[in-house]
Amino acid sequence: MEVATDQPRWMTHHAVLNGQHPESHHPGLAHNYMEPAQLLPPDEVDVFFNHLDSQGNPYYANSAHARARVSYSQAHARLTGSQMCRPHLIHSPGIPWLDSSKAALSAHHHNPWTVNPFTKTPLHPSAAGAPGAISVYPGSSTSSTASVSSLTPASHSGSHLFGFPPTPPKEVSPDPNSTSAASPSSSAGARQEDKDSIKYQVSLSEGMKMESASPLRSSLTSMGAQPSTHHPIPTYPSYVPAAHDYSSSLFHPGSFLGGPASSFTPKPRSKARSCSEGRECVNCGATATPLWRRDGTGHYLCNACGLYHKMNGQNRPLIKPKRRLSAARRAGTCCANCQTTTTTLWRRNANGDPVCNACGLYYKLHNVNRPLTMKKEGIQTRNRKMSNKSKKSKKGSECFEELSKCMQEKSSPFSAAALASHMAPMGHLPPFSHSGHILPTPTPIHPSSSISFGHPHPSSMVTAMG
């Protein structure tokens, strides 16, 4: 036996349990199906479908489902590999709607992974109008997507098949009351709802790409241009880290100006101070020094002892040497030429004898001893003129002192009080919510974890999440 070229070999026509010919359900698709050799008895229906479930072979009613399943299987195999989850509905003879319905499982057996959660279940109008048609999602309407079959298979699989892994629906018992026949009046509304679901899915995938960036970057970009407020399906983890990673004051309105310090405020670095506590110079016993050094054995030295040891190669003496008397008041010293005992600077002549500053300079310049007739009782000093650099530095210091006095006397416009008064009108900044998405809102909202959807979801999406 041969199967149609547009379907895999494992996808064959199911056993019609209600005694009707397949062409009565699908008049235009009779050539795509194989006529079964014989019909299965009603009591072997469960065994037949359990056998299909055990082999993992999905079963479809029309070619639209088959093409969507093949294209989705190829795309999903590249994404998930061997970790693909294949949940299925458990069928048992004890379920009343299986026993009472002559059509058993309608025209086909649904696999939740082949059905788009953003659309309704049957895609073919005849399948939707079958008397035994059963919806996987109880809250969905089978007639809402009756006109989707007008789409081409390529465009349908490209727009509806998932841009992200789907959420497997819960195992629910279909509601027989939810089935209804497709009517021309409802087809227009179904087409509009399906278009809305397509737009919602595309914008949702784009929003998830934007959310993959860092939280701070996404928050800054959302301040400039408000993106759509789509949220990921609640079964997946949030894309924003936990609240403890960032302080709540960062997104608090009062933290921008004059409010409590945010989590990014640099903390005072007291590590160096805490590490230096308890150190003591092994030479002089000092505990405070601008720079700690080490000797050859690794012991700590203060800056003074370390420099002395580095320059002289020996330890710095603990007792400071006495300061020598000034050259002018050196006891027992007199000039060998003029016999004076007071001078600003003691010098030595060629013989090594001490001479006063005047006699030493005179001998240095004229190579003769200074005559005694030039000796004076007082020491003549020169009135040196101040250089330009010293004048500028002095003027700068005086101007700084005057400016500081003026700042203390009068309230400057740069004072803290004036700055606070200027900051007060800035309180109209829009508050920010501390939820998963950071969006500027005109009115404050409570920082709760509840998800508010900006666009109405299809009923199947809401039912799957519920």
UniProtKB/Swiss-Prot annotation:
Taxonomy, superkingdom: Eukaryota
Gene Ontology, cellular component aspect: nucleus
GO biological process, alphabetically ordered: cell fate commitment; negative regulation of transcription by RNA polymerase II; positive regulation of angiogenesis; positive regulation of miRNA transcription; positive regulation of transcription by RNA polymerase II
Record carries keyword Nucleus: yes
Skewed-composition ranges (Low complexity): 139-155, 174-188
Tissue spec: Expressed in all developmental stages of erythroid cells but is additionally found in a limited subset of other tissues.
Chain segments carrying region Disordered: 139-196, 436-466
ZnF GATA-type span: 281-305, 335-359
Protein function: Transcriptional activator which probably serves as a general switch factor for cell-specific development. It binds to DNA sites with the consensus sequence 5'-[AT]GATA[AG]-3' within regulatory regions of genes.
Protein name: GATA-binding factor 2
Provenance organism: Gallus gallus (Chicken)
